[in-house]
Amino acid sequence: MELLDSRMDFQGCKIALICGDKVLTILRDDKENIPWPNMWELPGGGREGDESPFECAAREVYEELGIHLTEDCLLWSKVYPSMLYEGRQSVFMVGQLRHEQFDNITFGDEGQAYKLMLIEEFLKSKQAVPQLQGRLRDYLEENYDKT
């Protein structure tokens, strides 16, 4: 699986952690010097060293929320253009989050708050990072809109 391949060239990862009909979101810091200040986003961040996409996502989720992810939680992934670096790519993943993982979150020092938000609310919010809304929508359309 390419998510485990550290030779893949990518800038960073974001992961939508889904628990029932909700997604785990983080309210970004309200600082003018960061992209998308005071907006709801998904866990993740920049690659360190030669991490694989999964290693990058797992490290970021642990740093931001104290959650240990295992590879078996992954449901989907897709490579997209980087949100920050033109001409580079990033990886978007979707994984399952168990209620007990949410209940045991240890919130890190990035962001103002976290919450399990209804997926529909995240997709419609004017206060959510638009690129992440689109990427989550891609997953849902590919996996659930099979009418």
Predicted segment positions?
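Active-site-adjacent beta-strand/loop module that shapes the phosphate/pyrophosphate-binding cleft
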Residues: 19-21, 78-104, 115, 119-121, ...
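Short, solvent-exposed loop/helix junctions and linker helices
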Residues: 9, 47-51, 126
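The catalytic Nudix box helix
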Residues: 42-75
